[in-house]
Amino acid sequence: MTLIPPTDHKFAALHGAVWSGGSFVYVPKGVKLDFPLQSYFRLNAKGAGQFEHTLIIVEDDASLHFIEGCSAPKYNVANLHAGAVELFVGKRASLRYSTIENWSKNMYNLNTKRAVVQEGGA
């Protein structure tokens, strides 16, 4: 957790203590993917939490389109989603990151998402 240290806030600390699973994508220098990559996370338990971690590294002169989805069934009790996303974009690299979420009114969604983009990156 480089961009989101557990000392950042209490939900980052909770995430850092219990996260399991997530996505890791590494795009080497000069590689340009011409199709989107996707991941999907579903919370399937009442009164539970979801703490996935997404780490994406796109090196210099590379490109990626990444789509992430999260959802849960409608429950009559509260649930917590406290995921974390860290994005690193190299020089002249391109990252198009999208999130699609479908939560019920009983879901507390407290994601933390951060990015570092180097010169000429987008």
Q: Residue spans of the language-model regions?
A:
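Conserved beta-strand/loop scaffold segments within soluble protein domains that form the structured core
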Residues: M1-A122
